[in-house]
């Protein structure tokens, strides 16, 4: 056998190459349910001299779906952006895994939290599959890159995008783009995911699918934060709800404690009725309307 092709030498060479060019697993092992992954403490954000967030404190825990609700302009998306590190805070602190956000690099944050923004734009003509594959880029040259193919295939399947995976992202409908963007976030497989109005462009069936996915991920050990306008979805799927009013936390707790007629009527500036479904017992939040 030629020395150049000796199997032992080949294996030794591969091991050396991996030790030199492949990073070790950059994140700690999974943590128990209830562990805090993100914490905002007394944060404030000001734009144009106007407070957008004012003394907001909230924590994000493994195993929970935390839903942010409130009227337009209440600060929901700004709070999500502050938690993700995409929005600087003027006072207060935000910690990710017990370290200030400013102490993490962009890559380290991408390995710990995945973000779905409101606007899903792609500047080049990538296919849907390529956009989803981008979710795996934080794990390049780490042991977790071995999971790339499985993570991408699973995300495509559960977000129902397989049928148009090879079409250009720019040629997709708004709802299809939203599902592709969500698949990218899920393919990233981080311990925390933050979703800004993930159901906004979706039909009724896909709205339920998205929230079931959020619920399932939480049960599997993920911390999930979702911005929603639909209070019925929030009531059905949230473990905790934070109600924002003019940049401040008006309420923070389980849906049954937070979704009161008095609070919601005040926050939304419109009479609200909170009732129990006669069959399922689910909480329903309805605007009161004049009889026709």
From Swiss-Prot:
The keyword S-adenosyl-L-methionine does not apply. Belongs to the ABC transporter superfamily. Heme (hemin) importer (TC 3.A.1.14.5) family. This is Hemin import ATP-binding protein HmuV. ATP binds at residues 70-77. The complex is composed of two ATP-binding proteins (HmuV), two transmembrane proteins (HmuU) and a solute-binding protein (HmuT). CDD domains: ABC_Iron-Siderophores_B12_Hemin. Its EC number is 7.6.2.-. It is a peripheral membrane protein. Keywords: ATP-binding, Cell membrane, Membrane, Nucleotide-binding, Translocase, Transport. One of its GO terms (cellular component) is plasma membrane. It comes from the Bacteria. It is found in: Cell membrane. InterPro entries: AAA+_ATPase (IPR003593), ABC_transporter-like_ATP-bd (IPR003439), ABC_transporter-like_CS (IPR017871), P-loop_NTPase (IPR027417). GO terms for molecular function: ATP binding; ATP hydrolysis activity. Part of the ABC transporter complex HmuTUV involved in hemin import. Responsible for energy coupling to the transport system. Residues 38-271 form the ABC transporter domain.
């Amino acid at each position: 056998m030629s020395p150049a092709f000796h199997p032992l030498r080949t294996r030794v060479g591969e091991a050396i190459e991996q030790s030199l060019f492949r990073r070790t697993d950059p994140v700690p092992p999974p943590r128990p349910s209830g562990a805090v992954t993100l914490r905002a403490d007394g944060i404030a954000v000001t734009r144009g001299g106007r407070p957008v967030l004012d003394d907001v404190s909230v924590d994000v825990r493994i195993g929970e779906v935390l839903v942010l609700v409130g009227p337009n302009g209440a600060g929901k998306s700004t709070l999500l952006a502050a938690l993700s590190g995409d929005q600087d805070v003027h006072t207060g602190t935000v910690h990710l895994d017990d370290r200030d956000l400013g102490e993490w690099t962009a890559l380290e944050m991408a390995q710990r939290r995945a973000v779905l923004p409101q606007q899903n734009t792609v500047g080049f003509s990538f296919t849907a599959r390529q956009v989803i594959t981008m979710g795996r880029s934080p794990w390049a040259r780490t042991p977790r890159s071995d999971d790339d193919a499985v993570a991408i295939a699973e995300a495509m399947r559960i977000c129902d995008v397989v049928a148009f995976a090879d079409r250009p992202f720019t040629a997709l409908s708004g709802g299809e783009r939203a599902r592709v963007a969500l698949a990218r976030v899920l393919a990233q497989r981080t311990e925390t995911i933050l979703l800004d109005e993930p159901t906004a462009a979706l039909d009724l069936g896909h709205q339920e699918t998205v929230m079931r996915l959020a619920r399932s991920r939480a049960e599997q050990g993920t911390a999930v934060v979702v911005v929603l306008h639909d209070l019925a979805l929030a009531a059905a799927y949230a473990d905790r709800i934070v109600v924002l009013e003019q940049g401040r936390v008006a309420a923070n707790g389980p849906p049954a404690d937070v979704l009161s007629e008095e609070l919601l009527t005040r926050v939304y500036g419109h009479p609200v009725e909170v009732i129990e479904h006669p069959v399922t017992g689910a909480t329903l939040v309805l605007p009161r309307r004049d009889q026709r």
